[in-house]
Amino acid sequence: MVKIGAIAFSATLLVGTIAFAQTAPTKTGDSTKGKVLTDSKGMTLYIFDKDDGGKSACNGPCATNWPPLTASADAKPTGAYTIVTRDDGGKQWAYKGKPLYTWSKDTKTGDVTGDGVNNVWHIATP
């Protein structure tokens, strides 16, 4: 009886842990350049060479062209994902310390038209 109770208790803890585990804020998608990180809509995510120290350097008109992958106020870092505070006070997801963005000129899933723009924008890869 003790063995069965211990197994049932362990299973309950495991299910509880899984239920409360936060999922990653990105997905992995396919593109002509291989695997890329995507947002929840499947749009390619990018990183910016001018971002430094976990801080976004893309604000104002830059952020209009390169919308940040926003994080909700109650979002929590998970695994390789962290949250940075933008100059406007908004929250943005970062992967391995690099803030993540979409590109306004990508129109469908799998597009990677922002890769290499001005030699400072690159696809985010898993």
Predicted regions and their residues:
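Compact beta-sheet-dominated domain cores in extracellular/mature segments
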Residues: 2-7, 17-126
